[in-house]
Amino acid sequence: MSKKRLYEIAKELGKESKEVVARAKELGLDVKSHSSSVEEAVAAKIAASFKPAAAPKVEAKPAAPKVSAEKKTEKSEPAKPAVAKEEAKPAEPVAPKTEKVAAKPQSRNFKAEREARAKEQAERRKQNKGNNRDQQQNGNRQKNDGRNGGKQGQSNRDNRRFNDQAKKQQGQQKRRNERRQQEDKRSNQAAPRIDFKARAAALKAEQNAEYARSSEERFKQYQAAKEALAQANKRKEPEEIFEEAAKLAEQAQQVQAVVEVVPEKKEPAVDTRRKKQARPDKNRDDYDHEEDGPRKQQKNRSSQNQVRNQKNSNWNNNKKNKKGNNKNNRNQTPKPVTERKFHELPTEFEYTDGMTVAEIAKRIKREPAEIVKKLFMMGVMATQNQSLDGETIELLMVDYGIEAKQKVEVDNADIERFFVEDGYLNEDELVERPPVVTIMGHVDHGKTTLLDTLRNSRVATGEAGGITQHIGAYQIVENGKKITFLDTPGHAAFTSMRARGASVTDITILVVAADDGVMPQTIEAINHSKAANVPIIVAINKIDKPGANPERVIGELAEHGVMSTAWGGDSEFVEISAKFNQNIEELLETVLLVAEIQELKADPTVRAIGTVIEARLDKGKGAVATLLVQQGTLNVQDPIVVGNTFGRVRAMTNDLGRRVKVAGPSTPVSITGLNEAPMAGDHFAVYEDEKSARAAGEERAKRALMKQRQATQRVSLENLFDTLKAGELKSVNVIIKADVQGSVEALSASLQKIDVEGVKVTIVHSAVGAINESDVTLAEASNAFIVGFNVRPTPQARQQAEADDVEIRLHSIIYKVIEEMEEAMKGMLDPEFEEKVIGEAVIRETFKVSKVGTIGGFMVINGKVARDSKVRVIRDGVVIYDGELASLKHYKDDVKEVTNGREGGLMIDGYNDIKMDDVIEAYVMEEIKR
């Protein structure tokens, strides 16, 4: 069987869905909402419960015999009274509900009533057919019962089922009759419907008629007054007419003034529609006798009335009239002139550079025009939106008699201010702090051995277990005093820290082997220490060896500016043996003595500041940074800004790997809790709260990103004159590397003699040998050139120079170096060509051919070697020969070039001293486009 939803039933019956849902629940059906579906028979049952509302005039007489029949069946079947009562229950609460509804006047839905009547007739026919069918089945059952004879129990069940169906049908018919009777009562009691549209139309017609009558009366009155005035004017003289017109004008003005003063009383019913009124200033002409006259005249009058009604309309009475000569505003009293309030000038004025005239006027409560006038009298042409410098603002305040003070703006993201501010430290709270010592020197001179000896034999007393975690720095105790050693051996880390402005080292221990003497890296370490302005303690190591000569070491160091105190210098010399732990105590005592002379002090009461020694990313801990506290005390949970990152100190460990909660001045600790790993050499500072630390860290990261995007403008020979002219450079720093010591001395002396406009050349470092990575690092830190005289940079140094944007100039004639430097400083440098290295090759084998010369078998290791390129022969980093190729072959074929990874043979024009492992550098001269 098909199903129906409750809202479909409601639509068919013309009822609301909620009424149908309520009725279904009253009938005992399990429904939840209007979208619930029921069987077709149940739907018919629900529709039948609403049928009396759709059939107002149905006789209820046939219900009487069925009720009696129902009673008879109840009497004849005493075993079924409960079932009949249950079937009749749903109809009992319906009657009172329909009586309540009948009291309300409702509009009838004739379509729904017709559909309901049609369905009722169809159901009635269906029920009649069902009754006939039941009677036939009953007769068949009786025949079967007669045939079967012995099946008495089955016939009883069939009889009961038949009686139940009859009772059910009788109950339904009874309920239908009751609903029909109630609907008849409702239709008789229903009040007559009110047609609101008809009432509105009648009211409108009445208003239009009233409006037409009033308009006609006004027009007749106007015409009568006009005719009377015309008759009176005919009898009067012209002078009297003029006098009367003047009197009428005066009366009209008086009436208008009264109307303006006395507000009009609003009538209760105002018709805001456009009214057709006769114009008082023109005579109306009747053109009714003409065919087209009235229609045209009516059109013109309506257009004129539209304009007049727009002017006289009362739609927006509150809108101000823009015209000053309006009649309504003519007799109003003028507004009083507002007097300007006098504001006293402030006694003090706090200003910042770049304040505009309008801002100053607002602060001192004066008009901008007044300040512009004063500035004009002072000889300064300015507008109210123009910025003024500090001097002009101070002069302006003097003219007003106000004391001007410049506002000092504090940059919260600037960590460096904590290191330079005098008021940050409390002079009364300063205490002595341990010195920070860095050990430097040549790799093979026992520097690592000295570090191991100090670490293993001088660990802080009371600490058991030794060093369990290497964090880049450690402390030892000597004579009850602590000494902090930075585990940053070598000059590279020291220079990179100095390049970032982190001079955390107080003392440098320079380790020199007594048997080797001064080596190139020793000289570089001396230059780094002098550049950082750090005192040097020389430790002459390996004095236990047979070939040790300490006196020779002292003499060699004196040549490089490191003088012993015995010779009248300021550097302490100690002879030690790190391997046999000889004179180590004397070295530590010397360190404490130098530290005492320096008077190293710190304030442990302020918030901690310091420097990053090293940083890394740990898989389990995240960003881990080793910090050296320089001032103040660092605590766990302190909000901290480190370089361009920020965070909170989550955990803190000392050099022994043990957890600590407090770290004082000159104490190295490893911390976790940063959101990113900082750079070595960055400064750190503790802030008041996490909010300010976060703001400072984010601002520093933003500035670093902007700085990184901007191209770094380093000094070069091309922009040297502009830099000097702008006053940005007072001296030119140069690093000299040459093939022999004589060339180094000659070139240094020649460059130092150049003096242009008070600018001198400063030789930062000079040495013999190829240009290495240390030279590039030093040049990057010192913002210097590198001048190579008959030497070449190593591949690693060349890559680092390109990365750090350090300029390397290579020359073979000394006077060209001097001329180029002079022309650069005088602004006359105009290079036309630039050298470009196109490839490198290594000689694998040599072949000497009589009457031809030496042929070099080579392999290209980088770039290419071209036939028309120039070549240099480099042996051990020193240029041996510079010339051109005589021939270039690949096997037996002459070729124009040999590319990377291929082999070939070459001959150099005018040079036959080619040896194995010589480097052939191929280069071309390219024109520089300016």
UniProtKB/Swiss-Prot annotation:
InterPro entries referenced in this protein's UniProt entry, alphabetically: EF-G-like_DII, IF2_II, IF2_N, P-loop_NTPase, Small_GTP-bd, T_Tr_GTP-bd_dom, TF_IF2_bacterial-like, TIF_IF2
Family the entry assigns: Belongs to the TRAFAC class translation factor GTPase superfamily. Classic translation factor GTPase family. IF-2 subfamily.
G2: region residues: 466-470
Region annotated G4, chain positions: 541-544
GO biological process, one term: translational initiation
Localization of this protein: Cytoplasm
Residue numbers spanned by region Disordered: 50-195, 260-346
Gene name tied to this protein: infB
Annotated region described as G1, given as residue ranges: 441-448
Task of the protein: One of the essential components for the initiation of protein synthesis. Protects formylmethionyl-tRNA from spontaneous hydrolysis and promotes its binding to the 30S ribosomal subunits. Also involved in the hydrolysis of GTP during the formation of the 70S ribosomal complex.
Superkingdom of this protein's organism: Bacteria
Biased composition (Basic and acidic residues): 68-90, 110-125, 157-167, 262-295, 337-346
Name of the featured protein: Translation initiation factor IF-2
Residue segments, region G5: 577-579
Binding site for GTP: 441-448, 487-491, 541-544
